[in-house]
Amino acid sequence: LKCNKLIPLAYKTCPAGKNLCYKMFMVSNKTVPVKRGCIDVCPKNSLVLKYVCCNTDRCN
């Protein structure tokens, strides 16, 4: 699986066991992701952070 880094022009290949891509937003500003990468389990959203997870190459 390949996931985009913070700047989507760059991406990385996920290590074994991390089979989801994610992007994280501040709830107050959903237009600009603050973090992207590989993850094993999609985190729950909080009052401050929103996570979007997916499982295809560079979907984040």
From Swiss-Prot:
Location in the cell: Secreted; Target cell membrane
Tissue: Expressed by the venom gland.
Keyword Glycoprotein recorded: no
Keywords assigned: Cardiotoxin, Cytolysis, Disulfide bond, Membrane, Secreted, Target cell membrane, Target membrane, Toxin
MF terms in GO: toxin activity
Record PROSITE patterns: SNAKE_TOXIN (PS00272)
Predominant cellular place of this UniProt entry's protein: secreted
GO BP terms: killing of cells of another organism
Function: Shows cytolytic activity on many different cells by forming pore in lipid membranes. In vivo, increases heart rate or kills the animal by cardiac arrest. In addition, it binds to heparin with high affinity, interacts with Kv channel-interacting protein 1 (KCNIP1) in a calcium-independent manner, and binds to integrin alpha-V/beta-3 (ITGAV/ITGB3) with moderate affinity.
Family to which this protein belongs: Belongs to the three-finger toxin family. Short-chain subfamily. Type IA cytotoxin sub-subfamily.
Protein name per the record: Cytotoxin 3
Origin species: Naja naja
Lineage, top ranks: Eukaryota, Metazoa, Chordata, Craniata, Vertebrata
